[in-house]
Amino acid sequence: MATDMHKLLGTSEEDDDEEMDMDVKEEDDGDRRNRDKHAASGSSSNDEFMFQQSMQDQVGTPGGGGSRRSRPLEEKERTKLRERHRRAITARILGGLRRHGNYNLRVRADINDVIAALAREAGWVVLPDGTTFPSKSQGTKPTGGSSAVAAGSSASHIASQQTSPPALRVVSSGLRSPVELSSCRMKGVFTPAPSPYDMLPIQSPELVGSVNKAEGLVGCSVDVINSKQILEIPPNLTEQDFSGTPYVPVYVMLPLGVINMKCELADRDGLLKHLRILKSIHVDGVKVDCWWGIVEGHSPQEYNWTGYRQLFQMVRDLNLKIQVLMSFHECGGNVGDDVCIPLPHWVAEIGRTNPDIYFTDREGRRNPECLSWGIDKERILRGRTALEVYFDYMRSFRIELAEFLEDGVISMVEIGLGPCGELRYPSCPIKHGWRYPGVGEFQCYDKYLSKSLRKAAESRGHLFWARGPDNTGSYNSQPQGTGFFCDGGDYDGLYGRFFLKWYSQVLIDHADQILCLAKLVFDSSCIAAKLPDVHWWYRTASHAAELTAGFYNPSNRDGYSAIASTLKKHGATLSFVSGEVQVLNRPDDFSGALGEPEAVAWQVLNAAWDSGTPVARENSLACHDRVGYNKMLESVKFRNDPDRKHLSSFAYSRLVPALMEGHNIVEFERFVKKLHGEAVMNHHHHHHQQV
């Protein structure tokens, strides 16, 4: 089944020091052989790497006339870099198989497993010792060492596929701090999956000498040799043609503060101007948050929709569509938040006397970003349960703005299910000190969720399980530094499986109950739920960051199918927040965090498609350049899909003044046309690099 592939993880970063020590001598001899080979023939990726190492020996040896052999510690570090580079290639191969195939591979598959799986898929027989021969339908078993030759040639063929095209190598200085040094070194080891768009022409020589600017170079491998940067600039590649692909409607997310705290349009004239520009480039519509803290901000069941009515009328007059988000969370404190919109004032008053209405971590820190799911059925909000509060809010929207629903101006209603409107626990709060790529913490220590856990433990007959795990580290821990998330840790023991099943089921039950109410309210209108892209630590066994966020998705279990089935049950669309573009826009070390945004995305999308759930997407970080847009297109347009699967819509984040600038709006218009499946003329720009 396709879901088997969801568990295909890349190999973990297991730096076995003893093994590497044994390899140092052999690989040093290999350096010399490869230097000779590089001088003779030149251009394989392995030769380039060895050539770089020879340069490092020359530059790094004081006096210049000494031995080229580096100190043992440096050789060991070089060996580690080679190993990480090899594992990154393996992870990309696994990612491709996960995306396009259905192969029965073990969790920690290596390249031999990949070759064997491909051979078996092609009808060959592969024995446990690696002996490979055709099946009876293909021919007779070869004799002697021919199978080894076949296996070797297969490996050689796959390795040849990894060989990169010739690239310009530029050496310059300019590192200014150890942090920058580390950042560039890691970029030389791990790069995102190669694509026709993993490149960025260098427009000025200053880029070569500036690490801050070089961090934005896409697809350019940045290696470091004793305070020297080596930039490998891939050759120019033709952009993909998306003409004739299925039409994907494009929505632009409006500014978070488009409606002020008085429920009025903050800048009517400026907004109208921008909406007209969006209409002129054939954007389908806009997406807007309907903030609980604004509409029901002062008193229970007193709703003010005035500003939203004005906004919807303006959008309708321009013949645009609207996607609305029922935002039952606060705004402010998260990445990209530029305004502060708290929960309703009367809710905050209840929280001051009963802070257990908020999610709580093991240290007792409360998070007022949204209400705990433990009070969904607790009648503590001025005589109402949380579910009743959400239902009344949605019903008020349905009554007051019915005309926009009935005439189709509102094309989708997304139901906020947690922090940032996403279905997840607030496991990574910046306000409590979390920083990427920490594993986060479980958020189940308010008295209402604690009561639910106790009840679940009693029903299992193990009352001593009525507690959260005590060996999960802290917000910024890494999996291997904890007893719970490490390989073979407690997460996979009897108690761990019980706790994680309960923790994730609370999330699913919350979604199930609210979506049931939403379907009652909005009836025939399209509803949706948003899922985040929790990609860090995906290539470890435990998937720690996903576990704390409420997705029970370790390497031996599929945590997204049950969620997709719940959405399917209520006819809801799965709106997925895409994280792939972060590889381009952020200097985060994806290799060190063992993150794989594309793999997470494909697992979630396949879970949705397998259940028959429609999929919409939105980007998580702003992007105004062609390289970023092309990367997004790769993740939202499925050109080679035999079933012609496509998104129900794409929401672009977000409408800001920079988007409206001349060159940026031209690039965005190209992006919109490609999402619509229209032909786009390629205008080639010539860039000159001075070395």
Swiss-Prot record:
Enzyme class: hydrolase
SUPFAM superfamilies noted in UniProt: (Trans)glycosidases
Residue ranges with Acidic residues bias: 12-29
Entry EC number(s): 3.2.1.2
Low complexity bias: start-end ranges: 144-160
InterPro entries recorded: BES1_N (IPR008540), Glyco_hydro_14 (IPR001554), Glyco_hydro_14_CS (IPR018238), Glycoside_hydrolase_SF (IPR017853)
Alphabetized UniProt keyword annotations: Carbohydrate metabolism, Cytoplasm, Glycosidase, Hydrolase, Phosphoprotein, Polysaccharide degradation
Region (Disordered) residue spans: 1-83, 130-167
GO BP, sorted A to Z: polysaccharide catabolic process; regulation of shoot system development
PROSITE patterns: BETA_AMYLASE_1
Catalytic activity: Hydrolysis of (1->4)-alpha-D-glucosidic linkages in polysaccharides so as to remove successive maltose units from the non-reducing ends of the chains
Coiled-coil ranges (or none): none
Assigned GO CC terms: cytoplasm; nucleus
Localization terms from the record: Cytoplasm
Phosphoserine, modified sites: 195
Entry's Gene Ontology molecular function annotations: DNA-binding transcription factor activity; hydrolase activity, acting on glycosyl bonds
Residue spans of biased composition, Basic and acidic residues class: 30-39, 71-80
Major location (coarse): cytoplasm
Residues at the catalytic site: 422 (proton donor), 618 (proton acceptor)
Sites where the protein binds substrate: 289, 329, 337, 530, 535, 619-620, 654
Domain of life: Eukaryota
Similarity annotation: Belongs to the glycosyl hydrolase 14 family.
Name this protein carries in UniProt: Beta-amylase 7
Biological source species: Arabidopsis thaliana (Mouse-ear cress)
